Amino acid sequence: MRSVTNAFGNSGELNDQVDETGYRKFDIHEGILFCIELSETMFKESSDLEYKSPLLEILESLDELMSQLVITRPGTAIGCYFYYCNREDAKEGIYELFPLRDINATFMKKLNDLLEDLSSGRISLYDYFMFQQTGSEKQVRLSVLFTFMLDTFLEEIPGQKQLSNKRVFLFTDIDKPQEAQDIDERARLRRLTIDLFDNKVNFATFFIGYADKPFDNEFYSDILQLGSHTNENTGLDSEFDGPSTKPIDAKYIKSRILRKKEVKRIMFQCPLILDEKTNFIVGVKGYTMYTHEKAGVRYKLVYEHEDIRQEAYSKRKFLNPITGEDVTGKTVKVYPYGDLDINLSDSQDQIVMEAYTQKDAFLKIIGFRSSSKSIHYFNNIDKSSFIVPDEAKYEGSIRTLASLLKILRKKDKIAILWGKLKSNSHPSLYTLSPSSVKDYNEGFYLYRVPFLDEIRKFPSLLSYDDGSEHKLDYDNMKKVTQSIMGYFNLRDGYNPSDFKNPLLQKHYKVLHDYLLQIETTFDENETPNTKKDRMMREDDSLRKLYYIRNKILESEKSEDPIIQRLNKYVKIWNMFYKKFNDDNISIKEEKKPFDKKPKFNI
């Protein structure tokens, strides 16, 4: 049966809208609403935050989030609101730092100026928000806040696309608001929660707890997890379980904000045909695993018209090469066949295409094979996709693909697929490989298999060292490398997003400083140590390498024999490397030139 989803689950699902005839494509336009409840403890310095207040940590995290989104997703809308605020420009106790609009330089500058004023001591958070601890009669009721959230998301903004993914980042450290003991008010909040759910608004909660004051999430779990229920027809749990109302420590505020910003971008949706004869079909959708942002590729062409900047658009024309006449409306598509040109109508062209493939995107299983015989490094010619079930059109897809995942894992096999991911592309071969048991992601990886003409042969070498002469040395080098790696552990695994692209960061820092009017000074007489510190601040990869280098150098001076081994292992590794490198050079020097045939002058 069709799975019941709710708006408090995975944010990527909000874009999976499907009509009755087929899959529909949507451009993701995400809106993030920061809602922060002010309290006495929000202004107090915390040792977990290097003696910063949680409120300042939230503001700095918001500034960093906007700096990242303007690079990766500049079309994202962000709004920031504080409730329980006594400022004169606050409406019903809700103060708007900036409204829910697409990221722009004006809002970024306003936030940046506020942070500069706070760091220089020109103003304090207490003074800026005019916060005064008063009784509950001044506190903003959650029903007013929830209604305000809904109205904000439903507001139509001229010149701004409709939001397809709506999220609320809710920050509070008050676990017992005034509504907690009011049964009628709780019921009203549940009804408002249903309204938010119906309008596809989901929550990312940041319930902040402290060592001396842990956060009790009973109240918020009661009102926010209302959308989680069981599918009565199948007895299966809902695909999503509502928002996480688990409290967090103050020190995790920034990392969680930057992690929660991620949205799952659907790359494609299509049916997966398991058996064409019996019409056994399930729905799947694919996500992009990684994207690589590049500097200087995002720009627009504009022109000035009556002192107003307008965006310029390109248009293609077809011209007669002799007369220069515009023949765009007279062109037709023909297929050359010998000395004839065959002109087919759209319907006839469709019939020809359907003779060898389907019109819409599809994937069809044509067989199974051992993983060891199918997954090869030289077949890696395209980006892989992560495949998960899609219950939107084909009910029972989750249960079916879960069984397929278990069987493929048990038999150590992969599925061979034939199909295409876009309606206007040509069919290709694919391998559908299950994720490993240790893998954090549970699903399938889809790899395109190249055709023969897409595989390039390795060049023939005049001299090639197969390593047989150094087999023992290679084995020893591997053991030494394993010992060295034992001293350096990635606690949370390798996450590419944790290592920023220095070229990309430099490009956008120049734009950022220019728009926000931030003065930058460059000392021509910069000392080597100062230059090194500056480079490590700008490049976190260099900073990590510098840390590893220092750890190796410090191990040589250590009195602990176990720590001293690290430096000894590195010296042995360098010895092997130098030996292999010298042998390779000697092989090249011994290479004899070809014997040239004598030339005869006639």
UniProtKB/Swiss-Prot annotation:
Keyword annotations from UniProtKB, A to Z: ATP-binding, Chromosome, DNA damage, DNA recombination, DNA repair, DNA-binding, Helicase, Hydrolase, Nucleotide-binding, Nucleus, Phosphoprotein, Telomere, Ubl conjugation
Modification sites for Phosphoserine: S370, S371, S372
A GO CC term assigned to this protein in UniProt: nuclear envelope
Effect listed in the UniProt record for changing T230A: In strain: DBVPG6044
Alphabetical list of CDD domains matching this protein: KU70, vWA_ku
One Gene Ontology biological process: double-strand break repair via nonhomologous end joining
EC annotation from Swiss-Prot or TrEMBL: 3.6.4.12
GO molecular function: ATP binding; ATP hydrolysis activity; damaged DNA binding; DNA helicase activity; telomerase RNA binding; telomeric DNA binding
Pfam families given in the database record: Ku, Ku_C, Ku_N
Superkingdom: Eukaryota
Catalytic activity entry: ATP + H2O = ADP + phosphate + H(+)
Stored Gene3D superfamilies: 1.10.1600.10, 2.40.290.10, von Willebrand factor, type A domain (3.40.50.410)
Domain Ku: 268-483
Location within or outside the cell: Nucleus; Chromosome, Telomere
SMART domains assigned to the protein according to its UniProt record, in alphabetical order: Ku78
Post-translational modification: Sumoylated by MMS21.
Function: Single-stranded DNA-dependent ATP-dependent helicase. Involved in non-homologous end joining (NHEJ) DNA double strand break repair. DNA-binding is sequence-independent but has a high affinity to nicks in double-stranded DNA and to the ends of duplex DNA. Binds to naturally occurring chromosomal ends, and therefore provides chromosomal end protection. Appears to have a role in recruitment of telomerase and CDC13 to the telomere and the subsequent telomere elongation. Required also for telomere recombination to repair telomeric ends in the absence of telomerase.
Subunit organization: Heterodimer of YKU70/HDF1 and YKU80/HDF2.
Family: Belongs to the ku70 family.
Entry protein name: ATP-dependent DNA helicase II subunit 1
